[in-house]
Amino acid sequence: MKKILILFILIFTSCENDYLDVVPDNIATIDLAFNTRTTAENFLSTCYTYIPEHAHAEQNFAMLAGDEVWYYAENDFYMNNETSFRVAKGMQNSSSPYLNYWEGGRGAPHSLFVALRDCNIFLENLVAVPGLEEEERLRWLDEVKVLKAFYHFWLMQMYGPIPIVKTNIPVGASASETNVYRSSIDDVVDYLTELLDEVIEADNLPGFINYIYTEKGRITMPIAKALKAKILMLSASPIFNGNSDFSSLVDNQGNSLVNQTYDPQKWVLAKEAVLEAIESAEANGHFLHQFNQQLPINGGVNDQVTQELSLRTAITEPFNSEIIWAFSADWTGELQQWCQPRWSADHSALFGYTKKSHAPTLNMVETFYTRNGVPIDEDTSWEYGNRFDVVQTPIFDTNNENYHEF
């Protein structure tokens, strides 16, 4: 019996294992994402989906992570914000960070390194797609290059020195290959500007969008040049240009990650990039928004009200001429609801829409300059000492016009 058992084991251990090395049918591969124009365009759309929602108070750290606005509570009947507002309250931490665009989570819907990986996959595989014209292929490639620069830039704004993701690390890479170093701010900026210069010189992007119902929000040449200008402006700013506060920020190879010597030439480069971006925008139909709609008011409105409406609708009117890059998937209605005050009890029917939560602090209000262009505590014609006095708003202004009419 023992001999039979040994023979049985030897027979089965000597069999070949090739029958296990079979890939099942109908398994999706990366090739399938680029085998038609439609599937390739879907992958292009995927590269866009990682764009953070700038108007989303919980996703954009610039919205509430400072003290420009403040909530009376982080949770109430109308809204909740337990991410960026907690950063403003000093609750940011390293173990489970808020607005974690590094890994995704805590207010950040995605890891932007995943976004960069998808961008690289697209750039590596959009080679010969059936049904895709060469002109369109080149445009798509440059769109994704700009997105790649944008995602790097967003990470740099949040974390300073970051790893540059030029190409994807293979899935089967060794542990040592996956341990990448963060690059210095100067190296990151150099790489991003080189990437954008490559796009600008190739001139494959449109100057403006013709098909507004299907392509609004897609990358254009003014967007690429504006992004380059923003990157160079941040590089030239005191944050990363000779900032001694970052003198101890070095990697384990002893390399300084933020340059410690102020370089005025960075402002020259930034100025040139800004001028080029402005010229490109103006040449492609972008200009300061002006309110020019007809209002059902006898005699119309005066210049002051028109100016106020121009400032207001520059924010609220979608895809107006002043906007260089508007992301069509972004939802701004909630932000406007949070900002909307409740003027009186007569508006009780609108209480579900006017949430009165997003408001500037008095500290921010006092930083505004007077009409003479100086801080309020330096303007001798402004009664700084009486700034907290309660005053009655007049029904009519100096032009004898009803203050509340509009």
Q: PLM ranges: what are they?
A:
Residues 16-83, 162, 166, 218-222, ...:
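An aromatic- and glycine-enriched ligand-binding surface/loop that stacks and positions planar moieties
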Residues 12-13, 30, 102, 143-144, ...:
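A short linear-motif detector with a strong N-terminal bias
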Residues 168-173:
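Short edge-strand/loop segments of extracellular domains
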Residues 38-59, 78-159, 175-216, 221:
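Conserved, well-structured interaction surfaces
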Residues 1-25:
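Bacterial Sec-dependent N-terminal signal peptides
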Residues 2-3, 148, 228:
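A general lysine-centric signal
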Residues 1-6, 60, 75, 95, ...:
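Terminal low-complexity, poorly structured segments
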